[in-house]
């Protein structure tokens, strides 16, 4: 069991029950999954770029990502239907908690001029989305071996019914929100 899983069971659940008045510990919001997505537009013309993005994503997430393909043809982007244009992976259970721990305690403090995450990134249904502009903030990525700086999207899916509950859950995990 990871450090954040222990923290969730021993500290977060009782604190949220006290704050929101849940009658059952199973009603307390919990993390369901974390989805990482990396769009690589240059992959339509250069296959090596996609291979490097897949390798970076595999190092960051600890599991093999899948290639995402375009759903429609767009002439202005010079892509056709079915061409590979990115990669994504979904983390659940212990890998999810390990990634979240590394994100909160190691990666986000390494971001230049980091002042906190804006709390307006909730979607209204208790899920949280954020972007990272550089993949080199993760300790698994060797800065000298990187061919290009790529960003990624991170979507944290919870069972919370509202943004307030989801924010309280992520606050309990010491998520660095901006004031």
Swiss-Prot record:
Listed InterPro entries: Ribosomal_uL5 (IPR002132), Ribosomal_uL5_bac-type (IPR020930), Ribosomal_uL5_C (IPR031309), Ribosomal_uL5_CS (IPR020929), Ribosomal_uL5_dom_sf (IPR022803), Ribosomal_uL5_N (IPR031310)
GO terms assigned for molecular function: rRNA binding; structural constituent of ribosome; tRNA binding
Keywords, comma-separated and alphabetical: Ribonucleoprotein, Ribosomal protein, RNA-binding, rRNA-binding, tRNA-binding
Example of a GO biological process term: translation
Pfam families according to UniProt: Ribosomal_L5, Ribosomal_L5_C
Cross-referenced SUPFAM superfamilies: RL5-like
Disulfide bond residue pairs: none
Family: Belongs to the universal ribosomal protein uL5 family.
The protein's role, per its UniProt record: This is one of the proteins that bind and probably mediate the attachment of the 5S RNA into the large ribosomal subunit, where it forms part of the central protuberance. In the 70S ribosome it contacts protein S13 of the 30S subunit (bridge B1b), connecting the 2 subunits; this bridge is implicated in subunit movement. Contacts the P site tRNA; the 5S rRNA and some of its associated proteins might help stabilize positioning of ribosome-bound tRNAs.
Protein name: Large ribosomal subunit protein uL5
Source organism phylogeny: Bacteria, Pseudomonadati, Pseudomonadota, Gammaproteobacteria, Lysobacterales
């Amino acid at each position: 069991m990871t450090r954040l899983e222990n923290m969730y069971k021993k500290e977060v659940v009782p604190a949220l029950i006290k704050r929101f008045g849940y009658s059952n510990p199973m009603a307390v919001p919990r993390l369901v999954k974390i989805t990482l997505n990396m769009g690589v537009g240059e992959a339509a013309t250069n296959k090596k770029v996609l291979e490097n993005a897949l390798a970076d994503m595999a190092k960051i997430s600890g599991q093999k990502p899948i290639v995402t393909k375009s759903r429609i043809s767009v002439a202005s982007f010079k892509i056709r239907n079915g061409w590979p244009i990115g990669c994504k992976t979904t983390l659940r259970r212990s890998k999810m908690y390990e990634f979240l721990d590394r994100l909160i305690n190691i990666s986000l403090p390494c971001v230049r001029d980091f002042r906190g995450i804006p709390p307006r990134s909730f979607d209204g249904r208790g899920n949280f989305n954020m972007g990272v502009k550089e993949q080199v903030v993760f300790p698994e990525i060797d800065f000298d071996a990187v061919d290009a700086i790529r960003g990624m999207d991170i979507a944290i899916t919870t069972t919370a019914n509202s943004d307030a509950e989801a924010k309280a859950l992520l606050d309990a995990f010491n998520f660095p929100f901006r004031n």
